[in-house]
Amino acid sequence: MAAKDLFHEVVRRALEKEQWVITDDPLKVEVGGAKFEIDLGAERVLAAERAGEKIAVEIKTFLGDSPITEYHAALGQFLNYRLALELSEPDRTLHLAIPITFHQAFFQREFAQLSVERYQIKRLIYDPVQEIIVQWIS
């Protein structure tokens, strides 16, 4: 089993505050002979007459010494998880959970902006102190 990131419970509580129901912790996906454990699976009913929205969230702390190395590893993991979900659960959307301080410091750089645009990285920006989701970025 993969080690839980430092802010795993923080993001879980933040999602629950926004009325998400955690369905899987972790969300286990097996496809093409590969097994993955994505940090969280969640869903939320949008309205009684509409289908529920389903997401998967990969939580990152980005507390390492090299921001670009941390991002590089997270991006590779995200792309593999997204492919696995497209094949096994196409109705579930993957989001990368990023602490607000790292987002403000790293994702304002031109390279980071070009990368998330090119690879269409959906991001969930969270505040680990207040335990809230600050922003959803598609």
Where in the sequence are the language-model features?
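Nuclease catalytic cores
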Residues: 3-8, 12
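Active-site metal-binding core of divalent-cation-utilizing nuclease and nuclease-like domains
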Residues: 21-56, 70, 134
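Anionic group-transfer/hydrolysis microenvironments
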Residues: 41, 60, 129
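Mg2+/Mn2+-dependent nuclease catalytic core
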Residues: 55, 60-80, 84-85
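Nucleic-acid nuclease catalytic cores
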Residues: 83-116, 126-128
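Charged, structured surface patches that assemble and position nucleic-acid processing machinery
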Residues: 118-136
